[in-house]
């Protein structure tokens, strides 16, 4: 596990935030820049070589000693792939978990995690942009307009037994029509779970989606389960290795590492799934695919936010995020499952989808983004103690 942590640290050390031709922030104070505490003074490709070497040493040691490996599905169904992914991130004592955080033993009546109470009030609500990152079940990139036209946004005919997307989507985001308490969850406006949450941009389904990863069907569904917060899994090791290979001009091997992670959930390889892209020759395109794979595989595992920072992705910080307003388009209205059987009518299978810019929880950095925000400020009182701590640039 120490070798795996070394790889993760060297990935950050080699990334653009610290390792670039220019410092990430040129505003005063610049003492930390001049002292090379937040910038190496230039781009150093040898740092990517060091990361690659650490990855190679890790996998060589793994080949000799064994034990750690990706959790694999026991079948080729969406449920089997979901079960493998669930075991990898959620259950203790699996072959994939390298480093984890454990605070308490099990959920019980007096040991609720406070984060679980934030979810019903809109905490951790997924966005449209995140939903769109998950590919189709075949591996091809998701196309919103095509999904609307084919009526297969999440399932065929809103049947949770016929999923159309990456199995990790359903294990990460609660989407309309997903199986929930033995029935289809109703996230359309007026639905059983979503009376007005999306239309008012408040509550658990403010964006038209709900959180599923770690939260499952609510705190009650987690009772008496062991708690597991993964910090580093084998899937991330393959993706770290892929990035290091790419930065050392080995795109073919990089793609092979990513494909190992995708194959675990039944997705085709990157090249087959992205025939409109030249992934072997376009390093920027391949880097985007690696970052997307990290977002889909490692959601809510403290990865995406720091990926955006270490790669200085001001473009992503400045991009306004959206939700998805879902309405029934079958002539019916309101909840279906909550009505008496003789008044339900046909099961809803057609919907109208309206994208909307999030306004109730808009972020300050969508406008006037400042690169100083990549690293937070140290408290002034701490800097003024005079023991050598220097303030980060721009603060």
Q: Where is each model-derived feature located?
A:
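Active-site beta-strand/loop architecture of penicillin-binding DD-peptidases
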Residues: 190-233, 394
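Residue-level signal for alpha-helical context at structural boundaries
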Residues: 24-25, 187, 253, 272, ...
């Amino acid at each position: 596990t120490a070798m795996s942590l070394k790889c993760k640290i060297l990935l950050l050390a080699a990334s653009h935030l610290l390792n670039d031709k220019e410092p990430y922030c040129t505003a005063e104070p610049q003492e930390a820049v001049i002292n090379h505490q937040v910038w190496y003074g230039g781009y150093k490709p040898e740092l990517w070589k060091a990361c690659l070497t650490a990855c190679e040493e890790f996998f060589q040691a793994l080949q000799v000693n064994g034990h750690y490996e990706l959790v694999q599905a026991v079948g080729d169904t969406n449920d089997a792939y979901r079960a493998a992914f669930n075991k990898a991130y959620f259950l203790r004592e699996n072959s994939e978990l390298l480093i984890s955080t454990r605070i308490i033993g099990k959920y019980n009546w007096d040991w609720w995690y406070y984060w679980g109470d934030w979810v019903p009030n809109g905490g951790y609500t997924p966005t449209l942009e995140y939903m769109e990152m998950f590919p189709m079940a075949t591996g091809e990139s998701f196309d919103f307009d095509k999904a609307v036209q084919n009526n297969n946004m999440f399932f065929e005919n809103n049947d949770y037994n016929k999923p159309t997307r990456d199995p990790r989507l359903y294990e990460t985001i609660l989407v309309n029509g997903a199986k929930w308490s033995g029935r289809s969850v109703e996230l359309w406006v007026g639905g059983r779970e979503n009376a007005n949450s999306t239309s008012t941009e408040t509550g658990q389904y403010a964006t038209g989606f709900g959180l599923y990863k770690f939260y499952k069907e609510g705190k009650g569904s987690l009772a008496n389960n062991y708690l597991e917060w993964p910090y580093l899994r084998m899937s991330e090791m393959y993706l770290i290795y892929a990035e290091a290979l790419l930065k050392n001009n080995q795109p073919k091997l990089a793609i092979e590492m990513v494909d190992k992670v995708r194959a675990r959930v039944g997705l085709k390889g990157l090249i087959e799934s992205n025939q409109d892209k030249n992934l072997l020759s376009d390093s920027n395109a391949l880097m985007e695919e690696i970052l997307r794979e990290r977002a889909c595989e490692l959601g809510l595992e403290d990865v995406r936010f720091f990926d955006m920072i270490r790669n200085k992705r001001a473009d992503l910080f400045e991009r306004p995020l959206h939700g998805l307003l879902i309405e029934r388009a079958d002539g019916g209205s309101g909840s279906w499952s909550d009505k008496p059987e003789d008044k339900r009518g046909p099961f809803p299978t057609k919907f109208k989808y309206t994208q909307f810019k999030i306004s109730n929880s808009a972020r300050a950095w969508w406008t006037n983004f400042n690169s100083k925000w990549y690293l937070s400020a140290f408290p002034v009182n701490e800097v003024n103690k005079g023991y050598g701590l220097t303030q980060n640039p721009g603060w």
